[in-house]
């Protein structure tokens, strides 16, 4: 039985993704479009967009979770860490939140809030703050501009 040999770009893609990505970039720069590994290239471009979307959604959820805890938790000790987390997530979010991703976040904002609220409630309950967890609002009390800006509760 004859062994089918994979094209060079498929072997590189499977064995050394970094080398494959550099090769594809070189081919694009040189205008050698017929040599591109289009199937994998399309897949990777789509995956990049998906990864960025997941990152933005995760950052927003984390910010909202920590804003809720800052607003509703009476505990003094963890506050500094919550502030630091919000600051770091906002800083990274600035680089990632494009106009099209902002529209997608706005369209799915209620669901994002529900998950952030659940995360905050779980964290508060875990630390014995059941009343604070129960007091979390069912609808998001923050605008997207407040979440992404310099606003604090």
Each model region followed by its residue ranges:
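Surface/interface-facing alpha-helical segments and adjacent flexible terminal/loop regions used
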Residues: 1-153
């Amino acid at each position: 039985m004859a062994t089918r040999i994979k094209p060079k770009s498929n072997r590189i893609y499977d064995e050394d993704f970094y080398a494959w990505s550099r090769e594809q970039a070189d081919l694009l720069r040189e205008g050698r479009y017929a040599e591109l590994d289009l199937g994998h290239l399309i897949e990777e471009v789509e995956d990049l967009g998906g990864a960025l979307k997941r990152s933005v959604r995760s950052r927003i959820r984390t910010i909202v979770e920590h804003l809720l805890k800052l607003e509703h938790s009476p505990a003094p000790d963890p506050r500094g860490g919550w502030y630091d987390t919000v600051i770091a997530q906002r800083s990274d979010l600035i680089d990632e939140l494009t106009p099209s991703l902002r529209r997608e976040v706005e369209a799915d904002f209620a669901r994002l809030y529900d998950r952030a609220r659940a995360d905050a409630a779980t964290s508060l309950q875990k630390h014995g703050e059941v009343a604070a967890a129960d007091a979390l609002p069912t609808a998001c009390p923050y605008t997207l501009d407040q979440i992404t800006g310099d606003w604090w509760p």
